[in-house]
């Protein structure tokens, strides 16, 4: 007996393991001599950065820094800022790590700051470090059979298979001037960066990424009136990422995550602090897919032998959409009771969101947290935290039972309008990148064995008369009488695999 089963594969990204670890941040800081005494702490912020990720065997190690920034009013009535870095290193061990791509994210959970004296600060905080390890899960299925008298029923599905995933870290840095129109720098208060992809091109296992890194810096000006200034600078991103099997037909989903950002002030030729030295550590996370039409065997039997087959529920993914979109989020913030006269600065502290599929729309809904540095009518500087809700909707033509949708959101801009009635209209621009997958579950045969030692007894009758009802499937009739669907169609001059009206059929012997 000559029997052959042809196989194919469906593949998807699988989370092999995930672990969240806590990294406490505790320090006692004494002000350097060049900074004046503390009168009142306005805001203490803790920003977590991952500078390097190393994988060795079944261990992945993440090194990073918790950057503390304390904004305070001095005893001389001036706005001051103190910065200090707290290095940390954490590792995670799991047997699955060795064969996975590992992604490490750090997030500030909380930070508390207390002025022990005019020159000492007691700070306690916590950073959560999440280790996520991803692999490409592959499942074999039967796509065709020949020999052994085996008959198969197949269906064709469009499948978006994962070819591979990769991660690469790189640095973008530049020294630039703040511009003649702006006053010189006294101290940097905070810096924020966003990386946006403008174009990608895949050729023979390599992907060229072109984009922009925008760095925004808030600083205290070298003036006598607590003046805050903002400067913005854009740097090009040009990187090549190696991804196995990536080509001009592959679908490449890329996320640029800024894992570390350092901005420092430098003197120009005249000795004034008018230069900024900015350096960003960026990690490019790439997933590569390919869409193809695939034949899958959903039922099988042999007219000659007994067979054993394994029917397995299998998730089939189809790419419905891949997009990058810009959305402007608007919210009205209540400032009643704050006696606010003007706003010195508004910054985005974080975005929390959930995703869902509502009828024919994708929905992202959540809250945007903002920090406000204000000046009261009595000329007192204060700090406030506020948040507002936002929604993003996108119409889609879904092709599956359920949807997988994991957006990547980057804040690309913000501004505000202070109203007369103790309210502030905040506007935050976000860039949303996402791939939208529809998922269907199909019962397919993943294994089949023909038992040549158990032949079937042939039918004694050359023809069998069967009275079929409208809507019956020729495949089911053929399987029941152990013959082939092609012979039934040929014998009865049928036009397809469905009985269109109540009739008498002649069932030939196989």
List the model feature ranges, each with a label.
Residues 1-458:
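Interfacial loop/beta elements and low-complexity acidic/Ser/Thr-rich segments
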């Amino acid at each position: 007996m000559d029997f052959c089963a042809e196989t194919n594969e469906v593949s998807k990204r699988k989370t092999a393991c995930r672990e969240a670890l806590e990294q406490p941040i505790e320090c006692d800081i004494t002000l350097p001599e060049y900074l004046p005494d503390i009168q009142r702490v306005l805001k203490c912020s803790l920003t977590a950065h991952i500078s390097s990720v190393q994988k060795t065997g079944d261990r992945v190690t993440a090194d990073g820094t918790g950057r503390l920034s304390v904004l305070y009013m001095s005893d001389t009535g001036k706005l001051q800022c103190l910065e200090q870095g707290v290095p940390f290193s954490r590792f995670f061990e799991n047997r699955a790590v060795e064969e996975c791509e590992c992604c490490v994210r750090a997030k500030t959970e909380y930070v508390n700051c207390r002025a022990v004296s005019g020159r000492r600060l007691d700070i306690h905080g916590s950073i959560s470090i999440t280790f996520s390890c991803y692999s490409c899960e592959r499942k074999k299925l039967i796509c065709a059979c020949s020999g052994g008298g085996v008959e198969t029923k197949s269906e064709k599905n469009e499948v978006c298979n994962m070819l591979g995933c990769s991660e690469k870290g790189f640095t973008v840095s530049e020294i630039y001037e703040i511009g003649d129109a702006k006053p010189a720098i006294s101290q940097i208060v905070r810096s924020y960066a966003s990386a946006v992809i403008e174009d990608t091109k895949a050729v023979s296992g390599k992907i060229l990424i072109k984009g922009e890194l925008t760095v925004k810096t808030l600083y205290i000006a070298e003036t006598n009136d607590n003046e805050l200034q903002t400067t913005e600078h854009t740097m090009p991103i040009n990187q090549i990422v190696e991804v196995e099997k990536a080509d001009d037909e592959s679908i490449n989903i890329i996320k640029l995550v800024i894992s570390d950002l350092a901005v420092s002030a430098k003197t120009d030729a005249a000795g004034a602090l008018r230069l900024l030295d900015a350096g960003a550590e960026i990690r490019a996370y790439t997933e590569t897919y390919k869409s193809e039409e695939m034949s899958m065997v959903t039922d099988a039997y042999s007219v000659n032998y007994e067979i054993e087959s394994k029917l397995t529920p299998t998730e089939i993914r189809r790419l419905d959409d891949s997009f990058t979109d810009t959305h402007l989020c608007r919210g009205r913030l209540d400032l009643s009771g704050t006696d606010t006269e003007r706003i010195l600065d508004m910054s985005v502290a974080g975005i929390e969101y959930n995703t869902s599929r509502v009828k024919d729309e994708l929905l992202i809904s959540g809250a945007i947290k903002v920090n406000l540095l204000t000046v009261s009518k009595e000329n007192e500087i204060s700090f406030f935290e506020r948040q507002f809700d936002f929604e993003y909707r996108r119409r889609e033509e879904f092709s599956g039972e359920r949807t997988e949708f994991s957006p990547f959101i980057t804040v690309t801009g913000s501004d505000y309008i202070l109203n007369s009635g103790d309210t502030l209209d905040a506007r935050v621009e976000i860039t949303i990148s996402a791939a939208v997958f529809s998922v269907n579950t199909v019962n397919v045969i993943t294994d089949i064995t023909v038992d040549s030692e158990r032949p079937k007894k042939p039918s004694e009758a050359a023809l069998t008369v069967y009275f079929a009802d409208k809507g019956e499937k020729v495949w089911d009739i053929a399987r029941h009488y152990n013959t082939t669907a092609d012979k039934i169609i040929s014998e009865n001059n049928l036009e397809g695999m469905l009985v269109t009206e109540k009739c008498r059929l002649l069932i030939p012997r196989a």
